[in-house]
Structures are given as C-alpha cells and as structure tokens.
Amino acid sequence: MVSRLLERADVFVQNLAPGAAGRLGLDADTLRAGRPQLIVCDISGYGGTGPYRDKKAYDLLVQAEAGLVSITGTETESVKSSISVADIAAGMYAYSGVLTALFRRERTGSGATIEVSMLEALTEWMGFPLYYTTYGGSPPARSGARHAAIAPYGPFSGADGETVFLGLQNEREWVRFCEQVLQRPELAVDVRFESNAKRVEHRFALEAEINSVFGKLNVEEIIARLELAKIANARMNTVAQLADHPQLAARQRWREVSTSVGPLRATLPPATIDGVDARFDPIPDIGANTDSILEELGYSEKIVSAWREDGLI
C-alpha cells in the first residue's frame, strides 16, 4: 500500500523510532532508489549519525539536552517550556526544508533527502544563550519572567491583582518611563539606575520603586500611562482571554470548521498571503475516506472487504 501511495507522492515524511524506517524499507536510500524525484524528510531526535543516533527522544528530553531547561525558570528551580518547542522547531525546519526541496525540484527535476534533528532545530533556537555563554563566559541567569540582561523588563502587578509586562530598550525610554509613567522624574538621574547595567545590578531596588507606584494603580491605568509614554507593554492574558483577544477578532483570525461533533472555531494560518483564502474543509472522522482512498489506489472491493473483516482497516 505504501508503494502505491508513493507512486503519486511528492514528499514522504517520517519520524519513526530510530532505525524503524530502515527495518521497514522506508529509509531514504531505498525509497529514492527507484524514485529519484521523491523528496524524503526524516525527522529524528538526534540525527542519523553520531553517538546519539539510536537514542529515543521526546520533547521535554530534547529541551533538557539542548540546555533550554537550564536557563528557564527561577533562581531556585528549572522548568520546561509549557509548549512543545522542540517538536515545533523540528516541524518548522522540516516544513521549510521540504518547501526548499520542492522549489529546487521545479528547477532541476531532482528530489532530495532531508534530515531534521530535534536537537539541532532547538539548538538553532538557542542561538542567543548559546553564543552569549560561549563568548560571554557565563550562561544567562534564570530570572523567571524577567529579562536576564535588561531592566526593567518583565511582569509587574497592579492594585487589582492583574499583571502587566513592560520592557525598556534605551535610555530615552527610561527617562520617559520615570517622568510619564512613574511620575518620579528624580529616578531618571538616580545613580543606581543611570544605565541598563546599573539597573540590572540594582534590579530589586528598581522594582521596589516601580511597585510603590504600580501598587496604587489598576492595570488599565498602568497600561494607559505606558501607552501614552510609548513604552512597550502587554497584559498577561490567560488562554481563555487569548481565545477572545480583541486583536484576533478585529483581524478576523477565526474561522468555523465543520466536524462530526458540530462546528468548531480554528485560527487562520499565521502567514496571510494577499489574494489567497485558506481552506477550512469539513474535518472527516478517522477512517471516513478509507474506502475512497483504497479504491483510488486500485484495490478491489473484495480485498477491502476482506481487510475490514480481518480488522486491518
């Protein structure tokens, strides 16, 4: 069946356990031997060579191997990312690699073998802390939701218990922040805070000054001041609040898709292409198209019925 599918396939993607594709005859060399135009993409934890080639990998484990967990969390505890960043990183590089190979095939007629390692994909995303550590001599400190090297940059609570994040990028913004947001212009010339390096050094004193002001304001009032001063900021939303985010609604980013359990909302793909409407066809149940696909592949009704009786489909 796989052979029949491959006869009309442009791309074959697999992320089976290490060595499984080869044992099944689905490795790139075997598949492309009679199909030089085929694009084969192998996704694995650590790649097909090297001492880790046979090592199993899951998202959290790769986060740990890539050093991400070591720099994420608080001073007292390392934590993982709450989304599957290693899986997503590998998937995105597989996606871009396949598109590149398809474009090249249009010009050359030749397929390609693509290898994507979860570790290598996440290592690419770890570029800043990796080079900061390699050439700066020490890794970025775990600082919770704060920025490790910029202050103030992180979360602050209002009198209503809500949280706002803000970040300053230069000294002009620092002066405006003191004058217009905190309404404490004397802090702009306080020697403890006269540069970003000083503000990081005296982070706790700085945050105490900010909290003394923000503790008397609700988050809406804080955001209003930040917006007026043109200081970057964001409200800390819950996932439920994200689902009802006014910006997503204003840009009409939600679509309704039909399913067997009724209509569900789904977001549009992030890349918006002028003149192209994303397809949101009804989502079929598992196995809903099995018969039509097998018929398309040339299997007789008798064979399909036998497979169904044997529980194969």
Model-derived regions: residue spans:
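Short linear loop/turn motifs
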Residues: 189-199, 236-244, 303-313
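A structured beta-alpha segment of the ubiquitous adenosine-cofactor-binding alpha/beta core
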Residues: 1-33, 215
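A glycine-rich dinucleotide-binding beta-alpha-beta segment and adjacent secondary-structure elements
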Residues: 228-280
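Flexible, small-/acidic-enriched active-site or ligand-binding loops
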Residues: 259-308
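Active-site-adjacent "lid/gating" segments in soluble enzymes
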Residues: 22-168, 176
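Non-transmembrane alpha-helical segments in soluble domains
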Residues: 3-6, 99, 174-179, 211, ...
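Residue-level signal for nonpolar/aromatic packing positions in well-ordered secondary structure
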Residues: 13, 31, 40, 59, ...
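Aromatic-enriched alpha-helical interface/lid elements that frame and gate functional surfaces
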Residues: 152-229, 233
